[in-house]
A protein has these predicted regions:
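Short His-Asn-centered micro-motif
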Residues: 212-216, 241
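Serine residues within intrinsically disordered or low-complexity segments
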Residues: 481-483
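A cross-taxon signal for low-complexity, glycine/charged-rich
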Residues: 485-488
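ER/secretory pathway lumenal C-terminal domains and tails of membrane proteins involved
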Residues: 21-207, 220, 225-471
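Sec/Tat signal peptide C-region and signal peptidase I cleavage site
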Residues: 16-20
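Positively charged n-region of N-terminal signal peptides that target proteins for export
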Residues: 1-4
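Bacterial N-terminal signal peptides
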Residues: 7-14
């Protein structure tokens, strides 16, 4: 199904009553295609029961690729439950030998090559585990799987191979990645709302910018826009999740025109003892030595460098310009830039349309953000413009207030009353006093220890209360939207 750029697909969603089926019964349907989110929440007993079911199924139907894939997803998740016991996980995989048996049953199939790539499987059936031997053929599985990728591939598969190509082939011919992302885009699996959000992020960046992303989820949409839809092709993307692979970092540096002296044997990066320090040095070097403007997303500031965030001195040099943060060693009027982005660059009217609800029972993307949460980001990041517009541009203030109200309407229609992230809960309240409007209350998480005495618990509650505050407050509209009118 091909999809036009920035089209929001409206769908009627029927609410279905909860089934009395158990999870194991539901996931034992022979017609079912399991995705990773189906098995994440299962306990070990449920996983073992499902393993037995699907193992019996592939024994009876040895050529059924979907059944083998289901068995692999279950066994792979079960091996993860060994936690830090790597030997136990390895012994489990060797005992079950799912991928080895798969190679005998469906050799050189897409399913086998995908599973072999994802499972650290040695080349020969029965061969003892040997990381060096596996590493030599690892990429062969990926390349062959990409060649065999079926038309009904899941979003997770598209993103798995996009991540592989980003890491392995940045700076090289982009034909393979472009073809893959074109198929992903045309599949309809990548949400239009997410694509619009990435577009607006790019719209706010100056020409030739470098964008620093935390995970591939921060750049998939931008790459679709760039390689498939042909917009913002001047931007360069650095994904920290791929920075473990030195050729990838070198390719990004070459694209950005940064000195390769960074990689010299006596450099600070080469001498770094911890990967965390390597990542910190990479970002610092990009920011401080690039002649190109450098940006990141607001959520990445605290998630980069293994979720520890940027160092405080570097963080202080990033200025909010709307959806993105811009690095500058010198202070400047970033609020003026944010106003320019809102008034001239961002396309915001799509936020008034009905969001297509995320159906996580079918969404197999590796990196997910609900469409309504993306919309909520606009409110958090643009709300500080409201006082300026109220004082200097009443018409613009009324427009932005109306836009905010419509976003809240959409969120409330999805029965969402708030979000939790960044150590805080954000509660959305409908307020009738003074006229119908919305408020967002930011409340820090209350973390209590069972060993806390009553005085400690009370102190924590007092601290939480002191930090709880209203951070967004819309104003009543002259003609309230239908959602608000229904709450009178």
């Amino acid at each position: 199904m091909k999809r036009a750029f920035f089209t929001i697909i409206l769908a009627a969603v029927a609410l279905v009553g909860a089934s009395a089926q158990t999870a194991v019964e539901r996931l034992s349907d022979p017609s079912l295609r399991l995705i990773k989110s189906d098995v994440w929440s299962l306990d070990t007993l449920q996983l073992d029961s499902l393993y037995d079911y699907w193992n019996d199924y592939v024994l009876a139907h040895p050529k059924n690729e979907q059944a083998w894939r289901n068995l692999f997803e279950i066994s792979n998740e079960r091996s993860v439950r060994f936690g830090g016991n790597m030997e136990g996980a390895r012994a489990y995989k060797q005992q079950k030998n799912v991928v080895g048996r798969m190679e005998e049953a469906i050799p050189d199939s897409y399913t086998f090559n995908y599973c072999a790539y994802e499972s650290y499987y040695p080349k020969k059936v029965g061969e003892p585990y040997d990381w060096a031997a596996y590493a030599r053929v690892h990429n062969q599985y990926a390349e062959r799987a990409i060649e065999l990728l079926p038309d009904d591939a899941q979003a997770h598969d598209y993103e798995t191979w996009a991540s592989y190509l980003i890491t392995q082939k940045t700076g090289q011919d982009t034909t393979q990645l472009t073809d893959l992302l074109t198929r992903y885009f045309e599949s309809g699996y990548y949400p239009a709302e997410a694509l619009q959000y990435h577009f607006n992020e790019l719209q706010g960046m100056d020409e030739g910018a470098i964008y620093i992303g935390h995970t591939e989820g921060d750049i998939y949409g931008k790459l679709i826009l760039q390689l498939v839809l042909g917009v913002h092709r001047d931007k360069i993307f650095y994904c920290e999740n791929s920075a473990h692979y030195r050729p990838y970092i070198e390719a990004v540096f070459q694209q950005a025109g940064l000195s390769m002296d960074f990689f010299e044997p006596d450099s600070a990066w080469a001498r770094a003892e911890e990967q965390e320090e390597e990542y910190r040095l990479i970002i610092r070097y990009i920011c401080e030595h690039s002649t190109r403007p450098v940006y990141t997303s607001a959520n990445c500031i605290n998630n980069l460098i293994f979720d520890k965030g940027l160092p405080n001195d570097l963080k202080a040099c990033f200025y909010n310009e709307g959806l993105t943060m811009h690095y500058s060693a010198k202070p400047y009027d970033n609020q003026a830039v944010k106003r320019r982005n809102v008034e001239e660059r961002y396309r915001l009217e799509y936020l008034r349309l009905s969001f297509m609800p995320n159906d996580y029972s079918k969404d197999s993307r590796r990196f997910k953000q609900p469409n309504d949460l993306l919309a909520f980001n606009y409110l958090l990041l643009l709300n500080d413009l409201m006082p300026y517009y109220k004082a200097h541009s009443p018409q613009r203030h009324a427009w932005l207030n109306s836009l905010f109200t419509d976003v809240f309407d959409q969120i409330m229609r999805n029965n969402v009353s708030g979000y939790g992230f960044g150590g805080n809960m954000f509660h959305i309240n409908v307020v009738t006093e003074g006229g119908l409007h919305y408020e967002v209350v930011q409340e820090p998480y209350l973390i209590e220890n069972p060993e806390d005495d009553e005085a400690t618990r009370q102190r924590k509650r007092d601290e939480q209360k002191a930090k709880t505050r209203v951070i967004i407050k819309t104003e009543p509209e002259t003609h309230p939207s239908p959602s608000l009118r229904g709450r009178e």
